[in-house]
């Protein structure tokens, strides 16, 4: 009798994806983040589902329904903070996952990489819409400022913004549609994750050396299932520490004030995971230029496979490229810090310099360094 694991039409798909999957024997903990992202997505869908059972997407009651969840629903506060801080964990894992792909040259699997970029955009859109739902001050003004950026698009901009708003300002129609889309998009993300994995399993995983590992593979289970569980335990520890001890550490105190269209907060800023892009947006004095820079700051990832000039795939044996990679990391952290600061000197000039450095490093310095390393290898 054949093993049901290998013969059953549904079970054999799971088997070939998570159990008998041939995996390089030398992948490090940097390869844990894919599975952590899957768990984050499941956590967000589950906590979000239970929150949606008690939430009302009406401007008059949205803020108070969130208060009701935290005060009156059994463990409602836990659900709310798991969902809010779960989003932060999601983005930490996302950025580390993308960073791993950049460092080890995983972007040479172009289909997997491009689906990943589309996923990143979709997750960012979902998180932005989720931030609007509690209908606090920062929710309202964040929604107003960010959606208003689309008015910079020539000719159709104003019509587009009013179409998204469902009126002449951010109001009830906007909140209702954002709730509907915020509920729907995670399921679309889950479907796209399947496509992401489908393309990944066509080629197999990359590994830290960047050298094909066909001759040295091990089954995913038990080796990497155990390794992933360790990563999961560490992530859950960090998440629960945030939720139970510092639930508002990453939030904005302004969001504990109900939305008031007549009172603008002194510093409008998005959640921490968008601050780097927000800093790039603010560093350009022109509105359309800022919006283009904002979109390109992430869309630039698409051309990274074209900018790969080195004869080696991974940065493991390329010290000069490693220096640039960590410079880019430090630059992104600087941008994140600047995004949370008021628009005044010296923050303006620091933000402008950091934005220039960000694009220069990716488009100019990294390809040139790759060529130089090729030359040094021959020398």
From Swiss-Prot:
A ubiquinone binds at residue 201. Its cofactor is heme b. The chain crosses the membrane at residues 33-53, 77-98, 113-133, 178-198, 226-246, 288-308, 320-340, 347-367. CDD domains: cytochrome_b_C (cd00290), Cytochrome_b_N (cd00284). Keywords: Electron transport, Heme, Iron, Membrane, Metal-binding, Mitochondrion, Mitochondrion inner membrane, Respiratory chain, Transmembrane, Transmembrane helix, Transport, Ubiquinone. This is Cytochrome b. It holds the Pfam family Cytochrom_B_C. Gene3D superfamilies: Cytochrome Bc1 Complex, Chain C (1.20.810.10). One of its GO terms (biological process) is mitochondrial electron transport, ubiquinol to cytochrome c. It is found in: Mitochondrion inner membrane. It comes from the Eukaryota. It comes from Myotis vivesi. GO terms for molecular function: metal ion binding; ubiquinol-cytochrome-c reductase activity.
């Amino acid at each position: 009798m054949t093993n049901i694991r290998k013969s059953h039409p549904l079970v054999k798909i799971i088997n070939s994806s998570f159990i008998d999957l041939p995996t390089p024997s030398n992948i490090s903990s940097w390869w844990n983040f894919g599975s952590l992202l899957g768990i984050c997505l499941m956590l967000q869908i589950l906590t979000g589902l239970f929150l949606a059972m008690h939430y009302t997407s009406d401007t008059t009651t949205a803020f108070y329904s969130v208060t009701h969840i935290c005060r009156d629903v059994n463990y409602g506060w836990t659900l709310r903070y798991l969902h809010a801080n779960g989003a932060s964990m999601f983005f930490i894992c996302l950025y580390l996952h993308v960073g791993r792909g950049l460092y080890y040259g995983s972007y040479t699997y172009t289909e997997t990489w491009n689906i990943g970029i589309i996923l990143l955009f979709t997750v960012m859109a979902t998180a932005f819409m989720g931030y609007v739902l509690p209908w606090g001050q920062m929710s309202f003004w964040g929604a107003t400022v960010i959606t208003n950026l689309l008015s910079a698009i020539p000719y159709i901009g104003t019509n587009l913004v009013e179409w998204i708003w469902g009126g002449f300002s951010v109001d009830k129609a906007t909140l209702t549609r954002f709730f509907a889309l915020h509920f729907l998009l995670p399921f679309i993300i889950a479907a796209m994750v399947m496509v992401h994995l489908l393309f990944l399993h066509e080629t197999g995983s990359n590994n830290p050396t960047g050298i094909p590992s066909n001759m040295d593979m091990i089954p995913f289970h038990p080796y990497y299932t155990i390794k992933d569980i360790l990563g999961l335990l560490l992530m859950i520890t960090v998440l629960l520490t945030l939720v139970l001890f510092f639930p508002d550490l990453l939030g904005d105190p302004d969001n504990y004030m109900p939305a008031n269209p007549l009172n603008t907060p002194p510093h409008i800023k998005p959640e921490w995971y968008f601050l780097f892009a927000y800093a790039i947006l603010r560093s350009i004095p022109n509105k359309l230029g800022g919006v283009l820079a904002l979109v390109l700051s992430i869309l630039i990832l698409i051309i990274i496979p074209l900018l790969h000039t080195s004869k080696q795939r991974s940065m493991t044996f390329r010290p000069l490229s490693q220096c640039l990679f960590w410079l880019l990391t430090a630059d992104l952290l600087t941008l994140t810090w600047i995004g949370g600061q008021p628009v005044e000197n010296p923050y303006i000039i620091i933000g402008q310099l950091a934005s220039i450095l960000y694009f220069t490093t990716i488009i100019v310095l990294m390809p040139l360094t790759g060529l130089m390393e090729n030359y040094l290898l021959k020398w």
